[in-house]
Amino acid sequence: TNVVGTTNVLEASKNAKVKKFIYAASSSCYGLAQTPTDEKHVISTEYPYALTKYMGELATMHWSKIYKLPAISIRIFNAYGPRVRTTGLYGAVFGVFLKQKLANKPLTVVGDGKQTRDFLYVTDVAKAFLLAAKSKKKNEIYNLGASKPQSINRLAKIIGGEIIYIPKRPAEPDCTWANIKKIKRHLKWKPIVPFEYG
């Protein structure tokens, strides 16, 4: 779906002459990245979700360059908030913890929990997409995160409850950390919601 669905929407957007196409890409395309990670970092997709999301981004940039569809790709780091995904192999840790907490089950921390993630609240994500849509920028790629990594152990402590540790998955990064200088400069965007309040 990430690839076929995206190309279908790109083609429909081209035919409808939409003013701007914003693609929700994923920071997972960076794999085990050097941090903080900027948009020029080498791509290293380590699992199927990352690969298909990156293929969707490639398609978006292709339509932008070849068919002149004004498009921007935003590589979202670790978004969280209401209606966050709670299931699936690559479900966001925040959503998984929340589901476990509501079911009175222990929180399952992958690895030792010292790994960090660049969590960004969903309203900050929405604001970035709105600014991108209204901007004159096109054929650009932006990282989107808070640029303040938080440990999984800290997240588990904030949510509260019993914690059990499970083995680390292959290709699991120790840290995700967005360099957001480009999006700040181009779109005048900045994160607002502190981690503790989200």
Give the location of each predicted region.
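Conserved SDR Rossmann-fold cofactor-binding beta-strand/turn motif
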Residues: A25-S26, R75-Y80
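C-terminal amphipathic/interface module of NAD(P)-dependent oxidoreductases
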Residues: N179-G198
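Catalytic helix-loop patch of NAD(P)-dependent Rossmann-fold dehydrogenases
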Residues: T1-E11, N15, K19-K20, S28-S73, ...
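Glycine/proline-rich active-site loop of Rossmann-fold NAD(P)-dependent oxidoreductases
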Residues: Y54, A79-G95, A103-K105, V110, ...
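Conserved mid-core alpha-helix of short-chain dehydrogenase/reductase
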Residues: N8-E11, A59, F119, D124-K127, ...
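C-terminal "lid/loop" region of Rossmann-like NAD(P)-dependent oxidoreductases
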Residues: D112, I141-Y142, Q150-K181
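Hydrophobic "lid"/C-terminal helical patch
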Residues: F129-A133, A156-I159, I180, F195
